[in-house]
Amino acid sequence: LRSLVGSEMCIRDSLNSQATVNALDTIVGWYRDGVIGPAIMGEQPDGWGGIEAGNYAMIVEGPWFFSSEDKLDTYTPALIPSVDGRSISIVGGEDIVMTSTSSKKDAAWTFIQFLLQDEQQVAMAGAGMIPVTASAMEKVDTSNAPYVDVYMQQLKTAQARIPCSSWPTIETVLNTAFESVLRGDATSQEALDAAAAQIDELLAKE
């Protein structure tokens, strides 16, 4: 899988590499040992329910988890654990998009540029949004929402999903592969080899 355009990940095939196989094997081991809860398979308790009931020690969640102030009294945000010196998460949230068929491209581009100015980014941060530019992050006052600092630090090493129209299908392929391994229907190598072949076909059509 040639993924994550614009990052170091785009220069190598990595989906079914030995490192990825080892990583998935580790996740499967954690799941079988009960280190990872049933939420990974869409079962109960889910992430929020599990951690609030004391079933889970940690969850991976966005800043919206702390929308209720009392959560900061109970939970502490932290960076994604580092592997080989890299702490990587996926960039999610909202997108600003200008479609290729738009009849107002100039106006759309002007509006996008306006939204990405530091002044607007900082203003939106006051409403709970995390700035999407490094320059705006440096100007945000997080005294009323200290958890935001951790998320902004994590964004420095975050990676975006691949920019392609086939992403929803690719996500389904990946989810199916991971689930088959967690259920014991395939080995990590078998599932990832099959997924890589399917995804390469999809990417070839882009």
Where are these regions (language model features)?
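Short helix-loop capping/hinge motifs at secondary-structure junctions, enriched
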Residues: 20, 30-33, 101-108, 180
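Short helix-initiation/N-cap motifs at beta->coil->alpha
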Residues: 38-52
